[in-house]
Amino acid sequence: MTDSNQQSELSKRQIDSVIALYSAGQYQEAINQIKILNDLYPNTPFLFNLIGACYKSLGQLEGSAKMFETAVNIKPDYSEAHKNLGITLKDLGHLDAAVESLNRAIAIEPNYVDAHYNLAITFKDLNQLDDAVKSYQKVIEVNPNFAQAYNNLGNLLKDLGQTDEAIKNYQKAIEI
C-alpha cells in the first residue's frame, strides 16, 4: 500500500500509524488521521489512495471512487490507485470504466497480478469470456501459484465447453 516516492515528506511513523489503524479495521479513525495529514501534506496521492481504501471498507463506494480518482489525477502513473479505482467502479456497476482503470494500471505495471485478476473478473461480469480467459492466463503466467485464478479459469473454460482444459485447471488449483 505504500510507495516511498509518493510520501517522501511523510514520516515513517505517520505512515505506520495510519496503516496500523487501517489494518486494525479502525477505518473512521484512520480517515480522521489521514485528513489531518492531508492538511499538512496536501496533494499526496498515497493519502488519497489510503482514504479511498478506508471509504471502500466502510461501504462508501462513491466517496472511495472520488478519492482514488483524486490520487490518479495527482499522480497519473500510480498503478495501485488505478487498480483500486477499477475495482471500486466494478463494485459500483460501472464495468466499462472499471476495465479502463484496470487497463491503465496494467499499462503502468504490465505484470500487476491484482489488476489482471480483477480485469478477468470484470470481463466475466461483462460476459466477455474470451477476454476473461486471457486475463486469467496472464495472472497464471505471472503468478503460477495463484490457485483461485486456476479455479476461475476452469469455471470459464467449463462454461465455454472446454471441459478437458477446465479439468486441468481445477486439478492445478487443487495441487496448489
Residue ranges of model-derived segments:
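TPR-adjacent "capping" and linker segments in tetratricopeptide-repeat scaffold/adaptor proteins
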Residues: M1-R13
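Alpha-helical segment of the N-proximal tetratricopeptide repeat
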Residues: L10-L40, A53, S57
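Conserved alpha-helical positions within TPR/SEL1-like repeat arrays
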Residues: I15, I19, F46-S57, E80-D91, ...
